[in-house]
């Protein structure tokens, strides 16, 4: 059952690259090993934090292939397949199927124009018709231009049992609560994508959250998950105060990915280079992150 496997603290891992913007295989394998070793419940590869749309298609697929291989069959991996048209997403999923992946994370289409709610339902209908893997809905309006309503997410979930869940990074907590009420006691997985809402979401019945800094600060993220899942309000809020401090790291560089990559480089051997045209992290920004981590 998917709900026994794809829940918990599942970070969207960064993609380490060399000066030619090719995936650094050894470093990426090291990130996956760290996630496993510190007790995180799985990984999300080729997400926004993994610079999925900045990588070339070949390098994006290579990153997914490396992560699936390093994770092995027993460690959950969710793979980003988001793209600008339905057929492109289908092609990405077929490549994922060939690599042995079993969960594809799918957003509404984007770039040329913003999709509507109905178009996004049709997007998922067509994907389901032509692919075999499980699908995770990804609501991230800051990048797609469309905030999926709870009603649309419910419609998509009802299309097929292969739609196993939703990662909601909309920041719309009332909408997320509506989903929690609707899917209570079901097998549908609800992941909170906004870390600042993780504690409240866990206490109200979420199945997990997807924080990019979890491999850097695993204990605080796992404690919020564990105590939130157990309904221990006092302990959840105590650990959430520390989590709020951790989250001040995100805006310390001009790009959240740059901040996260630099922080990751302090716990895993890897370059903190971001993909062009992202501005490189500065010495003063690094000093702020060093001070927080020390």
Where are these regions (language model features)?
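Catalytic cores of TIM-barrel enzymes
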Residues: 2-5, 188, 264
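Active-site beta->alpha loop and helix N-cap motifs at the rims of alpha/beta catalytic domains
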Residues: 3-11, 15-147
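C-terminal alpha-helical cap/extension of soluble enzyme domains
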Residues: 8-14, 38-40, 203-206, 213, ...
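Charge-dense, low-complexity intrinsically disordered segments
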Residues: 22, 54, 58, 114, ...
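A general structural signal for well-ordered alpha-helical segments in protein cores
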Residues: 28, 60, 64, 89, ...
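Alpha-helical structural signal in soluble globular domains
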Residues: 38, 62, 66-71, 95-99, ...
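Secondary-structure boundary/capping positions in well-ordered alpha/beta enzyme cores
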Residues: 74-75, 134, 163, 186, ...
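Catalytic alpha/beta core domains of metabolic enzymes, predominantly
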Residues: 143-244, 250-251
